[in-house]
Amino acid sequence: MEVLKEMIDMLVEQATTVRKEWSAVCDSVIHEKPKFIKRTRDKMWFSNLETISEILEVYHFTTLKYIEDDNTITLSLNEIDLIENGRNEQEARLNMGKAILDYALEYYNEYQMYSRSPNRKKHIPYIFKALIIDDPEKIGDMLQCQNGKN
């Protein structure tokens, strides 16, 4: 266990070094690999958006789809408690994409509160996925829909 800790410590760059060599560190993160950074007892991770997008690739937005009595479509998001309706599936998907992105922005703006709430902590990967995509139409198009039971 101690050997593993020493190996991990070898990967960590000190914050003072990062500050002094900021431009070189940024270039390295963008073109080479992420960095682990330590400031006193705090540890953090610095990467480009491509890397975090790859990590988040395993997270999917899934919905249950309901056909209402008026033939509109309602989508219920499984990962986050969001429900949206539209005249057809495409409109419902777009509405859900907008709702996901709106929630992601609110979550990020109130990150300290939301990320510490036990029922919302698991939303973190979905929040960052939505913020990185930053396009309600793309988010709506990537929804994986299954038929729900009315």
Predicted feature locations:
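Short, charged, surface-exposed hinge/linker loops at domain edges
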Residues: V3, I8, S23-T63, L94-N150
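Generic structural signal for individual residues within well-ordered alpha-helical segments
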Residues: R19, Q90-R93
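Polyanion-binding surface elements
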Residues: D9-K20
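Short aromatic-glycine-(Arg/Gly/Cys) micro-motifs in beta-strand/loop hairpins
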Residues: Y59-N78
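N-terminal pre-first-transmembrane soluble regions of secretory-pathway and organelle membrane proteins
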Residues: M1-V3, A15
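Conserved short-loop catalytic and cofactor-binding motifs
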Residues: E6, M10, L77-I80
